[in-house]
Structure formats: C-alpha cells, structure tokens
Amino acid sequence: MDFKRKLSEVDADAAEDVKMDMGATIIPQRERATSVIEDFLHQENSELKKSLKNLEMENEKLKNILKTDYNVNYIRK
C-alpha cells in the first residue's frame, strides 16, 4: 500500500509540474493571441474608416448632381 500511495504522490507532483509548465506557456500564447486580435481590429478599423470616407465623398457627389441637375436640395434631418 505504501508503494501505491507513493506512486499517487509522484503522479500528483508530476501533474502539478505539468500545470505549472502549461501556465508558463499559456500566458505568452494568450498575449500573442491578444496582440494578433488587436492588430486585426486596428486594421479593420482603418479599412472601415477609408470606406466611410469614400462613401461620404460619393454621397457628396450625388447630392451635387441632384442639386445641379434636378434643383433638389438635399437636407439631412
């Protein structure tokens, strides 16, 4: 019985070592993943801002066409 108890203690110690090792690798992986996600979000945000500017410019052109060709004043409420 002492042998089984000792074996379970060794297994528990080994399991704790594995948990500690995994914790040491999980944190850098999580930080890397967070960094990649943040980079992606910043890039997407930049692309969305560019798209918005393009749409605003196109909208202004269309308003000018309405105003000059059809005498329609576009009023935003």
Swiss-Prot record:
Residues 38-71 form a coiled coil. The keyword Coiled coil applies. Keywords: Coiled coil, Stress response. Induction: Highly up-regulated by fetal bovine serum. The keyword Coiled coil applies. Plays an important role in survival in host blood through increasing tolerance to stresses such as heat, salt, or cycloheximide, which is essential for virulence. This is Blood-induced peptide 1. The gene is BLP1.
